[in-house]
Amino acid sequence: MKAGDLIQYRPDTGGAFLGIITKDPGIHLEYNKVAVEIYWQDDGSYTYEHVEIILDPEKEWLELISESR
């Protein structure tokens, strides 16, 4: 997982939102876990998301859908 990869978020309310990882994985000081920064195209916001959640196949609401080269 690295900058440029595409993330999809599917909330319980339906729909899907696409985000682009803007920073490679690193320790996020607030969470004290490995996280990536994501730019969400629908509203122009940035969030940090835990890498372990994105890669967990049981967490279907947030997933890596395309890896950049």
Which residues make up each language-model segment?
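Intrinsically disordered, low-complexity, charged/polar segments
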Residues: 33, 38-69
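Glycine-centered tight beta-turn/hairpin loop motif at sheet-sheet or coil-to-beta transitions
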Residues: 12-14, 43
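Short coil-to-beta transition motif at edge beta-strands of beta-rich domains
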Residues: 1-12, 20
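Short beta-strand-centered aromatic/proline hotspots
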Residues: 15-28
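Short linear proline/tyrosine/threonine-rich motifs used for host-factor recruitment
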Residues: 7, 18, 48-50
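A short, compositionally biased
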Residues: 2-3, 30-35
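Hydrophobic aliphatic residue packing
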Residues: 7, 21, 34-38
